[in-house]
């Protein structure tokens, strides 16, 4: 299973202003299309289309435990080597679940390739994470902390949260983004560094920028 397209509730102009190459309503990062559907389309990362789903998963836009998913038969787009901001690829998609085992079962049932479950808390307090390999990209599903589940009134379906991109020259990319990017720090993954886009960037979802895998 591989990612064809992500649909994000942002205006194309917002991404272009941050140094992404945008044509019409589409931005191709690596081999993934990002369709910028506008602020009126929803909130954040609305959904995705996947190639190679098992069975009838995604045939009619059915959710995978809350993650809006459609089946794609599209060929790979022509890859974009690098955007003006220096970003070259999508590293991973982040989703959050109140019940990690339930979400993992739904994703595996659709044919997604579970690589591992990390049974250690993250610095942000998430107790567990599951990682799925989707071609060159990763889906990271994060178990919501108990206090977050309590705040939202108990169990809820999984939802998309954010994106992480690869910037080989992270210092140059952060300099290009100026006040819209955070300071660079060590990532949780050993040997990698990370920065994030600030709210001033004006995007509809959290975005991280990372150095490539060492």
Task: Indicate where each model-derived feature is located.
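Vicinal oxygen chelate
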Residues: 1-10, 26-89, 117-144, 164-165, ...
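Extended intrinsically disordered, low-complexity coil regions enriched in Ser, Thr, Gly, Ala
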Residues: 9-28, 101-126, 154-159, 172-181
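A short, structure-level motif marking secondary-structure boundaries and short turns
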Residues: 87-90, 157-159
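Internal active-site segments that recognize and position negatively charged phosphoryl groups
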Residues: 88-108
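A structural feature that tracks compact, well-ordered secondary-structure segments
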Residues: 103-106, 140-154, 163-168, 175-176
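General N-terminal targeting signals
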Residues: 112, 131, 149, 156, ...
């Amino acid at each position: 299973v591989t990612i064809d397209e992500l649909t994000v509730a942002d205006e194309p102009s917002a991404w272009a202003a941050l140094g992404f190459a945008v044509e019409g309503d589409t931005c191709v990062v690596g081999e993934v299309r990002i369709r910028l559907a506008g602020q009126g389309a929803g909130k954040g990362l609305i959904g995705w289309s996947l190639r190679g789903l098992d069975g009838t998963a995604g045939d009619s836009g059915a959710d995978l435990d809350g993650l809006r998913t459609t089946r794609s038969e599209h060929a790979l787009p022509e890859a974009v080597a690098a955007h003006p901001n220096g970003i070259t690829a999508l590293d991973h998609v982040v989703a959050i679940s109140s019940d990690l085992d339930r979400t993992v079962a739904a994703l595996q049932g659709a044919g997604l390739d579970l690589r591992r479950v990390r049974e250690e808390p993250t610095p942000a307090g998430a107790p567990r994470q599951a990682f799925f390999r989707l071609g060159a990209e990763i889906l990271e599903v994060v178990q919501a902390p108990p206090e977050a589940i309590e705040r939202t009134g108990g169990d809820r379906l999984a939802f998309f949260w954010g994106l992480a991109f690869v910037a080989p020259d992270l210092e140059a990319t952060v300099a290009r983004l100026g006040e819209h990017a955070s300071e660079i720090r060590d990532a949780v993954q050993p040997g990698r560094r990370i920065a994030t886009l600030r709210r001033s960037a004006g995007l509809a979802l959290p975005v991280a920028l990372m150095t490539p895998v060492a």
